[in-house]
From Swiss-Prot:
It comes from Homo sapiens (Human). One of its GO terms (cellular component) is extracellular matrix. GO terms for biological process: lung development; lymphangiogenesis; lymphatic endothelial cell migration; positive regulation of angiogenesis; positive regulation of endothelial cell migration; positive regulation of lymphangiogenesis; positive regulation of protein processing; positive regulation of vascular endothelial growth factor production. It is linked to Hennekam lymphangiectasia-lymphedema syndrome 1: A form of Hennekam lymphangiectasia-lymphedema syndrome, a generalized lymph-vessels dysplasia characterized by intestinal lymphangiectasia with severe lymphedema of the limbs, genitalia and face. In addition, affected individuals have unusual facies and some manifest intellectual disability. HKLLS1 inheritance is autosomal recessive. InterPro entries: Collagen, EGF-like_Ca-bd_dom, EGF-like_dom, EGF-type_Asp/Asn_hydroxyl_site, EGF_Ca-bd_CS, NOTCH1_EGF-like. Residues 270-279 have a biased composition (Pro residues). This is Collagen and calcium-binding EGF domain-containing protein 1.
Length: 406
């Protein structure tokens, strides 16, 4: 039985189901899948006990290879001052790190000298205190600061006048005049008018003296008890007499309450510098600077190979190696070479005699046969190594001829 062919509507529904299946699966899984952005390594920095944080960041090597670099910096809320990380709200001048004046320059210590002092860089380089030295204004001005006499002081100077002169209000000019002129009570003494001092005429001084005397007399006429004091206040006046004598002084009273503190005085002159202290410990390494921008650097092709370098030095002679195995014995030796050498020497002697004497001299010694004459020699024999022939008892005289002269 043949099954009926599928209808067009069923085929369309099957194709639609196959195409929508993956989409429905993604929609179903979308509720369980979430996207989360991982924080960078720089956001996960950990602050150590020394308040120094280490941050990792990608960087390039000189060869162009990507690697990881590390940067050290102070933790958040801290700043780097004198080799260590301190809180940002900390006063860097609180511990007096400078010799004279200290300024907090955006978290860094800025040391300066007082007016009238100069900074000596060479002494600071050698760690020889003091670093701030007094300026001798009198010597550096060539006598132009004061009219008469210039006296140098720590951080400043003052002017003095010679005998018969008085100093003016500017503290530098001197005019001729008496130091203590006769004052009639209506003129002020010129030498008393100085910067930072009070002055008064003789008339004013006399008036103040009379006023003080009157106050003393009124105080002496005051009653000793409260009743008489009340009468005195209500209007009962007691006439003062110039002949009244004060009574004996009373007993000292108890200690009164302490008074309020006076105004702050002006700072005194700086004292002598103390001996130099021991050098402090070496500070910790500062944080690494920002990484350079290498995005504009392009990596080029590799260049050609350069010429070979100079040869290195010869090494030392090595140790002698172990001796090798002993070889097999060689062929038997022969005296042919020795006889040839003796014949060559004899020939040289003969040529030397011909050159010296003009003719060949005959020796009474036995002549040696040449190798090519061995077969025709009457006593030709095999002169080998001596292993195949018995030893001869008779010997030949193989010495060279000794009679060179005729």
């Amino acid at each position: 039985m043949v099954p009926p062919p599928p209808s067009r509507g069923g085929a369309a529904r099957g194709q639609l189901g196959r195409s929508l299946g993956p989409l429905l699966l993604l929609l179903a899984l979308g509720h369980t899948w979430t996207y989360r952005e991982e924080p960078e390594d720089g956001d996960r920095e950990i602050c150590s006990e020394s308040k120094i944080a280490t941050t990792k960041y990608p960087c390039l090597k000189s060869s162009g290879e990507l690697t990881t670099c590390y940067r050290k910096k102070c933790c958040k809320g801290y700043k780097f001052v004198l080799g260590q990380c301190i809180p940002e709200d900390y006063d860097v001048c609180a511990e007096a790190p400078c010799e004279q004046q200290c300024t907090d320059n955006f978290g860094r210590v800025l040391c300066t000298c007082y007016p009238g002092y100069r900074y000596d860089r060479e002494r600071h380089r050698k760690r020889e205190k003091p670093y701030c030295l007094d300026i001798d204004e009198c010597a550096s001005s060539n006598g132009t600061l004061c009219a008469h006499i210039c006296i140098n002081t720590l951080g400043s100077y003052r002017c003095e006048c010679r005998e018969g002169y008085i100093r003016e209000d500017d503290g530098k000019t001197c005019t001729r005049g008496d130091k203590y002129p006769n004052d009639t009570g209506h003129e002020k003494s010129e030498n008393m008018v100085k910067a930072g001092t009070c002055c008064a005429t003789c008339k004013e001084f006399y008036q103040m003296k009379q006023t003080v005397l009157q106050l003393k007399q009124k105080i002496a006429l005051l009653p000793n008890n409260a009743a008489d004091l009340g009468k005195y206040i209500t209007g009962d006046k007691v006439l003062a007499s110039n002949t009244y004598l004060p009574g004996p002084p009373g007993l000292p009273g108890g200690q009164g309450p302490p008074g309020s503190p006076g105004p702050k005085g002006s700072p005194g002159f700086p004292g002598m510098p103390g001996p130099p202290g021991q050098p402090g410990p070496r500070g910790s390494m500062g944080p690494m600077g920002p990484s350079p921008d290498l995005s504009h650097i392009k990596q080029g092709r590799r260049g050609p190979v350069g010429p070979p370098g100079a040869p290195g030095r010869d090494g030392s002679k090595g140790e002698r190696g172990a001796p090798g195995p002993r070889g097999s014995p060689g062929p038997p030796g022969s005296f042919d070479f020795l006889l040839l050498m003796l014949a060559d020497i004899r020939n040289d002697i003969t040529e030397l005699q011909e050159k010296v004497f003009g003719h060949r001299t005959h020796s009474s010694a036995e002549e040696f046969p040449l190798p090519q004459e061995f077969p025709s020699y009457p006593e030709a024999m095999d002169l080998g190594s001596g292993d195949d022939h018995p030893r001869r008892t008779e010997t030949r005289d193989l010495r060279a001829p000794r009679d060179f002269y005729p």
